[in-house]
Swiss-Prot record:
<feature type="topological domain" description="Extracellular">
    <location>
        <begin position="25"/>
        <end position="244"/>
    </location>
</feature>
<dbReference type="GO" id="GO:0016787">
    <property type="term" value="F:hydrolase activity"/>
</dbReference>
<dbReference type="Pfam" id="PF04203">
    <property type="entry name" value="Sortase"/>
</dbReference>
<dbReference type="GO" id="GO:0005886">
    <property type="term" value="C:plasma membrane"/>
</dbReference>
<keyword id="KW-1003">Cell membrane</keyword>
<protein>
    <recommendedName>
        <fullName>Sortase B</fullName>
        <ecNumber>3.4.22.71</ecNumber>
    </recommendedName>
</protein>
<comment type="function">
    <text>Transpeptidase that anchors surface proteins to the cell wall. Recognizes and modifies its substrate by proteolytic cleavage of a C-terminal sorting signal. Following cleavage, a covalent intermediate is formed via a thioester bond between the sortase and its substrate, which is then transferred and covalently attached to the cell wall. This sortase recognizes an Asn-Pro-Gln-Thr-Asn (NPQTN) motif in IsdC, which is cleaved by the sortase between the threonine and aspargine residues; may only have 1 substrate in this bacterium.</text>
</comment>
<feature type="transmembrane region" description="Helical; Note=Membrane anchor">
    <location>
        <begin position="7"/>
        <end position="24"/>
    </location>
</feature>
<comment type="similarity">
    <text>Belongs to the bacterial sortase family. Class B subfamily.</text>
</comment>
<keyword id="KW-1133">Transmembrane helix</keyword>
<dbReference type="InterPro" id="IPR005754">
    <property type="entry name" value="Sortase"/>
</dbReference>
<keyword id="KW-0812">Transmembrane</keyword>
<feature type="topological domain" description="Cytoplasmic">
    <location>
        <begin position="1"/>
        <end position="6"/>
    </location>
</feature>
<keyword id="KW-0472">Membrane</keyword>
<dbReference type="InterPro" id="IPR023365">
    <property type="entry name" value="Sortase_dom-sf"/>
</dbReference>
<feature type="active site" description="Acyl-thioester intermediate">
    <location>
        <position position="223"/>
    </location>
</feature>
<keyword id="KW-0378">Hydrolase</keyword>
Length: 244
């Protein structure tokens, strides 16, 4: 009798667990679907603005700033899902779990380090984004660890209110948060050169992009593991070339 009661309780608990787990899966699916729809609308809006103002970047971002004043840029990699606004908060925690409409989302936003200057670029501009495992946000950074992918995607597009840029990728590697790869400025040219040399040395891809202390670079950073918290990181670094 006791065993029968025990088994009944276990069955009830299992049903409850399945219901809760199923609810969370459905909830996540609905939220992700809504988030994709929101980004698609913004992508279409940005594309329309770009076609109208190809020579002048400022008007596009005036429109985006009306949506959220923290939208400071746009990053795109043709042929992939990387096509997002770049946010910048007062800290590096502001947009970890907020989208461009400041709604709480598990994927957060692509965001720029709060220390970076927008008009007068630092030596190293840093962008962060989640690795979420569904080919969105900064998932594409993992692909850069393969030479074959790099060969087909050497240039990333970046826009901000002050100009249009090409990001010429020259390094991709795995590291941890103990590695101080997120320095934004350097004491002198020698210090910066050492950083550039180390960035090239760590790379798992071969690149012929020439980078000197006169250049500015952009570092894209994401977690190595898409499904659990980790101190491991995937890093892609590019030389910044102003186009207009």
């Amino acid at each position: 009798m006791r065993m029968k009661r025990f088994l009944t309780i276990v069955q009830i608990l299992l049903v409850v667990i399945i219901i809760i787990f199923g609810y969370k899966i459905v909830q996540t699916y609905i939220e992700d679907k809504q988030e994709r729809a929101n980004y698609e609308k913004l992508q279409q809006k940005f594309q329309m603005l770009m076609s109208k103002h190809q020579e002048h970047v400022r008007p596009q971002f005036e429109s985006l700033e009306k949506i959220n004043k923290d939208i400071v840029g746009w990053i795109k990699l043709s042929g992939t899902s990387l096509n997002y606004p770049v946010l910048q908060g007062k800290t590096n925690h502001d947009y970890l779990n907020l989208d461009f409409e400041r709604e709480h989302r598990r994927k957060g936003s692509i965001f720029m380090d709060f220390r970076n200057e927008l008009k007068n670029l630092n030596h190293n501009t840093i962008l962060y984004g989640h690795h979420v495992g569904d080919n969105t946000m900064f998932d594409v950074l993992e692909d850069y660890l393969k030479q074959s992918f790099y060969e087909k995607h050497k240039i990333i597009e970046f826009d901000n209110k002050y100009g249009k840029y090409q990001l010429q990728v020259f390094s991709a590697y795995k590291t941890t948060t103990k590695d101080n790869y997120i320095r934004t400025d350097f004491e002198n040219d020698q210090d910066y050169q050492q950083f550039l040399d180390e960035t090239k040395r760590k790379s798992v891809i071969n690149s012929d992009v020439n980078v000197t202390v006169k250049d500015r670079i952009m570092t894209l950073s994401t977690c190595e593991d898409a499904y659990s918290e980790t101190t491991k990181r995937i890093v892609v670094v590019a030389k910044i070339i102003k186009v207009s």
